[in-house]
Amino acid sequence: LHLCDRRQRQMCIRDRPVIEAHPEYEKQAILERLVEPERTLMFKVPWMDDNGQVQVNRGYRVQFSSAIGPYKGGLRLHPSVNLGIIKFLGFEQIFKNSLTGLPIGGGKGGSDFDPKGKSDREVMAFCQSFMTELCKYIGADTDVPAGDIGTGAREIGYMFGQYKRIRGVYEGVLTGKGLSYGGSLARTEATGYGLLYLTEEMLKLNGIELAGKTVAVSGSGNVAIYATQKAQELGAKVVTVSDSTGWVYDPEGIDVAALKEIKEVKRARLTEYKNYRPNSEYHEGRGVWNVKVDIALPCATQNELHLEDAKQLVANGCYAVAEGANMPTTLEATEYLQKNGILFAPGKASNAGGVATSALEMSQNSERLSWTFEEVDGKLQNIMVNIFHNLDDAAKRYGMEGNYVAGANIAGFEKVVDAMTAQGIV
């Protein structure tokens, strides 16, 4: 299948019971059709920097699958971006979007442009040039990109403005927009809140209450902050957060207001946290997974939780891990946690709250409505609870009860394949 990435091979292996149970899939070449994008776009992005020099970056949009709805997936702006990374992320996005139960297909895009160190004018120049080409291939009912690494509210705003200027229409062609021009309430909180809604449901099904439990969270960005906030609202105690230089241990529970001020207002390092909570400890480097906790929520970055970390969590009596970041747990660590009976919620399910709320933003845009925070949050909670029950049911149907990684892959896969089968060979 020409899938060089180990995670894609793992997914195909986990879906083998489904394929064996449906010989018609092989006859229709479902896998061969699924792993090839419907469309791959690659284009130059010329723009002028503040010194009057013309710069050229490369832009990408991989429109992977529209079997269940318009292509949906973020735009990543980072020097590491290449076609291989975008294709892999787009492939994963198909199944994450499918799990939400909402009518959204899978796609991904981006550029090797680095917004760090660039002026606002340079970022605007790049975004306008990028959208000048991309606008030919996207639309509210065709392909709806969103933010990702390097693409925040500023970049989305510049891209939306250029799309509107060229196409002459005001439509929900991007999500993650500002509230003043079609964005959704609760979008900022969605991934972190959704993580806790799914984690709570996973624990509940296994006879465990979230309230009263001790939680380790890694990261201190958007997902980590709102995961911490929601965990403490639900009665748990979060005792750690981290950033790229070190981590904080607060035995009394992380002060979310202090964390927000440090990270969202001051944009400072966690070394300042001790100024707010004198009884807390700051440690340089890694080590957040060495703390004895009941639940671990990796919310920082890809491949942050290694095999040795998994061994430490098991030794310390941790009994649940749910991924808040995209693929933060290595394959070896995931397998070790599962073999040792740890409840493990994979990111394609547990951090799907962000894309789910993006789809809710699309719904509001199409209806020309703006829902209240409580309305969006209530819909998000229902979506996350349903995601968990769908993956749990899928795992049970194929004799893999408790294997939520396999359950998530199967549940996402089945919906897409059913749609592909119904629509014929297209």
Please report, for each region that a protein language model flagged, where it lies by residue:
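Single conserved hydrophobic/aromatic residue that forms the stacking wall/gate
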Residues: 1-13
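Adenosine-phosphate binding glycine-rich loop
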Residues: 6, 202, 314-426
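Short, Gly/Pro- and small/polar-rich lid/capping loops
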Residues: 10, 14-42
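Glycine-rich, N-terminal phosphate-binding loop and its surrounding beta-alpha-beta segment
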Residues: 32-115
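Glycine/serine-rich phosphate-binding loop and adjoining beta1-alpha1 elements at the start
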Residues: 78, 97-211
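Glycine-rich phosphate/diphosphate-binding loop of Rossmann-like nucleotide-binding domains
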Residues: 175-178, 183-292
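Rossmann-like adenosine-cofactor binding region
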Residues: 246-344, 349
